[in-house]
C-alpha cells in the first residue's frame, strides 16, 4: 500500500471530496516551495491529478512529470514510469513505446496507472489483472469504475454493473451519482430491470438538484427499465420527462425518442411510434442511423406493413458498418417473402445465411420452398434452422413447428422425429395459440402410428 507523506493528507482529502481546485492549488505550492522530496511527490501527484482529466489534462500532466524528473532519481521509479506510460497510451502511442516503461511493482498506485495504460492500448484482460486493492480514496473508486468500463467492453454486463456499484460505494456526490447511472445501464444490458431500478433510486438520492442533462439520462434509463419489466405506460411517462429535460438542456440524444417509440409500440400505438422513430432518425448520427432503421423495419413488419418494412430494411442493408447486418438481411427476406416476392426473398435469405444469420435465413428459405410445394427442400431448410437456432428463440420455435408440419405433409414420414420435435416445442406455445392445437394433433397421430408399428413413406 502507498503511504503518502503526512503533508499530502490534506491534498488527498480534497481529492476524495472532489475539490480539485483546492488540491491543485495546494500541490502547486508544495511543488514550487517545498523541500526536494515533498516537491517531487507533489509534482507526481499533480501529474496524476491532471491525468484524471483525460486528454484535456495531457499537457499539464506532462509538464508536471518533467518537473518531477528534473529533481532527479526518477529514471527507474515505477510510479513515474507508469504515469508516463499512461499519458503516452492516452496520446495513442504504439505499444512498443508504452510497454517498456512498465517495471514490476506490487504498489497499487503504480498498478492502477499501468492498468489505465493497458486499457488505452486495448489490452483489456491484462488491464483487469493489473488492478489491486489498497489505493488512496481518490483512486479506489476510479479503479472500480475502470473495472466497470473494461467489463462493459468485454460484454460482461452483470459484472460491470457490480463494479460500478462498488465504485459508487467509495465515491461521493456527483461521482457516486454517475457511477450508479452506469451501473443501471449495465443492469439493463444484462436484462435485470429490477436491479436497474434500485440503482436509479440510489442515484436520485445521491444528489440534490440534478443537472437537466443528467436528469434526462436517469429518466431515459428508468423508461428502459420499465419497458424491460413490461410496463410500457410507466416507460412512456418516464421517457417523456426525459424528452422535456432534453429540450431544457439542449442535448438531444437519438435514443430518447427511440425508447418513446418502443413504449408506444407496446401500447399498440403504431402511427405515434413511427413518428417517434422518425424523430430518432432525424437526431441520429451516421453510426446511430442503422439502429433506428432496423427498429422501424421490424416495427412495420410486425404491423403487417410489409412495403414500408422493405423500404426501411433496404436502407439499412446499405449500411455496411452495421454489426447486425446479417439479421437485417434476414428481416428484409421476410418482408419480401410476405409480399410473395419469392425470388428476391430467397436472394436476401441466402445473403443472411452467408453473413451468419443462419437460423433466420434458413427459416425464410424453408417458407419459400414450402409455398412452392418443394417439400423435401423445405424440410432440409427447416431442419438447418432448428439446429442453428437457440432453443426457445422465435426462429427455433418456428423451425420446429414447420419441420413437424412438413413431415405431416409428407405422409407422416419419420414419426419419431415428429413426436420428439413436437414435444420439445409445445411447452413454448400458449395453449390458445393455433399452433398448439395443430402440433398436439400431429404428435398424437404420429404416436398412434408408432404404436401401430407403421413407418409410412
What are the roles of these predicted feature ranges?
Residues 9, 45, 83, 113, ...:
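"A position-specific structural signal for the A-helix of alpha-solenoid helical repeats
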Residues 23, 61, 97-98, 127, ...:
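Single-residue signature of alpha-solenoid repeat helices
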Residues 27, 65, 99-102, 131, ...:
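Hydrophobic/aromatic packing residues within the alpha-helices of TPR/SEL1-like helical repeat arrays
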Residues 5, 41, 76-79, 109, ...:
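Start-of-helix register in tetratricopeptide repeats
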Residues 6-29, 33, 51-52, 109, ...:
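Alpha-helical segment of the N-proximal tetratricopeptide repeat
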Residues 18, 54-56, 92, 122, ...:
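Residue-level detector of the short coil/turn that links helix A to helix B
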Amino acid at each position: 500500500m502507498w503511504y503518502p507523506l503526512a503533508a499530502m493528507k490534506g491534498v488527498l482529502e480534497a481529492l476524495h471530496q472532489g475539490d480539485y481546485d483546492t488540491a491543485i492549488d495546494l500541490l502547486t505550492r508544495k511543488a514550487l516551495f517545498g523541500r526536494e522530496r515533498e516537491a517531487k511527490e507533489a509534482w507526481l501527484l499533480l501529474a496524476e491529478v491532471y491525468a484524471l482529466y483525460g486528454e484535456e489534462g495531457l499537457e499539464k500532466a506532462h509538464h508536471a512529470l518533467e518537473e518531477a524528473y528534473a529533481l532527479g532519481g526518477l529514471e527507474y521509479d515505477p510510479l513515474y514510469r507508469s504515469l508516463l506510460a499512461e499519458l503516452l497510451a492516452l496520446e495513442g502511442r504504439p505499444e512498443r513505446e508504452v510497454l517498456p516503461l512498465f517495471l514490476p511493482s506490487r504498489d497499487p498506485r503504480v498498478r492502477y496507472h499501468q492498468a489505465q495504460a493497458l486499457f488505452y492500448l486495448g489490452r483489456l484482460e491484462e488491464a483487469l489483472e493489473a488492478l489491486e486493492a489498497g489505493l488512496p480514496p481518490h483512486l479506489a473508486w476510479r479503479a472500480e469504475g475502470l473495472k466497470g468500463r473494461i467489463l462493459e467492453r468485454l460484454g460482461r454486463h452483470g459484472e460491470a454493473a457490480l463494479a460500478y456499484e462498488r465504485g459508487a460505494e467509495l465515491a461521493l456526490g456527483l461521482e457516486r451519482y454517475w457511477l450508479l447511472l452506469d451501473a443501471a445501464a449495465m443492469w439493463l444490458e444484462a436484462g435485470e430491470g429490477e436491479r436497474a431500478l434500485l440503482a436509479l433510486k440510489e442515484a436520485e438520492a445521491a444528489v440534490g438538484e440534478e443537472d437537466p442533462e443528467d436528469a434526462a439520462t436517469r429518466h431515459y434509463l428508468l423508461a428502459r427499465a420499465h419497458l424491460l419489466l413490461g410496463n410500457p405506460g410507466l416507460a412512456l411517462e418516464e421517457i417523456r420527462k426525459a424528452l422535456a429535460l432534453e429540450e431544457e438542456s439542449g442535448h438531444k440524444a437519438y435514443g430518447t425518442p427511440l425508447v418513446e417509440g418502443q413504449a408506444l409500440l407496446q401500447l399498440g400505438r403504431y402511427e405515434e411510434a413511427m413518428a417517434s422513430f422518425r424523430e430518432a432518425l432525424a437526431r441520429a448520427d451516421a453510426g446511430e442511423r442503422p439502429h433506428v432503421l432496423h427498429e422501424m423495419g421490424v416495427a412495420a413488419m410486425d404491423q403487417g406493413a410489409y412495403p414500408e418494412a422493405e423500404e426501411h430494411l433496404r436502407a439499412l442493408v446499405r449500411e455496411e458498418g452495421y454489426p447486425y447486418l446479417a439479421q437485417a438481411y434476414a428481416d428484409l427476406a421476410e418482408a419480401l417473402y410476405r409480399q410473395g416476392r419469392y425470388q428476391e426473398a430467397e436472394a436476401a435469405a441466402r445473403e443472411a445465411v452467408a453473413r451468419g444469420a443462419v437460423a433466420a435465413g434458413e427459416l425464410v428459405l424453408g417458407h419459400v420452398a414450402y409455398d412452392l410445394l418443394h417439400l423435401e427442400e423445405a424440410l432440409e431448410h427447416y431442419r438447418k434452422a432448428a439446429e442453428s437456432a437457440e432453443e426457445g428463440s422465435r426462429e427455433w420455435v418456428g423451425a420446429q413447428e414447420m419441420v413437424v408440419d412438413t413431415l405431416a405433409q409428407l405422409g407422416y414420414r419419420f414419426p419419431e422425429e415428429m413426436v420428439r420435435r413436437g414435444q420439445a416445442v409445445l411447452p413454448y406455445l400458449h395453449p390458445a395459440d393455433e399452433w398448439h392445437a395443430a402440433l398436439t394433433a400431429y404428435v398424437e397421430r404420429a404416436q398412434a402410428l408408432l404404436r401401430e408399428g407403421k413407418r409410412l413413406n
